[in-house]
Amino acid sequence: MLRSLRSQRQTARVSIEREPLLTAGIGLMLVQYVESETAWIPSAVKGTTNGAVAASEAAKLGVPWGVSVWCDLEGVKPGTPAQKVIDYCNSWHAAVSGGGYVPGVYVGYHAGLTPTQLYRSLRFTHYWGAYNLNTDQYPAVRGLQMKQLRPARKDVVPNFGIDFQIDKISADALGGRPTLLALEGWPELP
């Protein structure tokens, strides 16, 4: 399960939501959504600020170091120079890794970077793709470790009050995998 983190607004819940998920056998990672899914302009300053907030919120939720925290990269305003996107992402990465977490990037619609830029210009080694991300948009060489799936009726869990999505997790082309918080003895990936 991916739990969202605030970028500017206060987190609605704290660690009280963590334990029921873990007890139910659900692994937990964190994602910080961007300010707009349609037209935002990234910068190095925003990356540093948002990354610091993500690391701080992860700590407030009681998530231990070493768990993946994901940067949402989508909705970049068309025409934004790629270097601004790169600076945002690398600053976000530095802040999150400086907090002890494993930074990953969610590549969604209008990410503002080419597959080669995603792989060669960013510090990230963990990539997660939107359900509508085509294979020719995946980070060059490495590929994805997680792929969001289209929601299906069978994915709804009865009597579970949290909205969630299904993602397929696998090793990328270089053997990398995301890390998550789970109870001791949680199944390992094949």
Where are these regions (language model features)?
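Accessory recognition modules or surfaces
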Residues: 40, 57, 65-70, 111-132
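Hydrophobic faces of well-ordered beta-strands that scaffold small-molecule active sites
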Residues: 1, 26-32, 67-71, 103-105, ...
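Active-site beta-loop-alpha junctions enriched in small/polar residues
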Residues: 3-6, 33-35, 74-76, 108-112, ...
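Functionally critical loop-and-helix segments that line ligand-binding/catalytic clefts
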Residues: 117-190
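Substrate-binding cleft of extracellular glycoside hydrolase catalytic domains
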Residues: 1-90, 98
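Aromatic-lined carbohydrate-recognition surfaces of secreted/lumenal glycan-active proteins
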Residues: 97-114
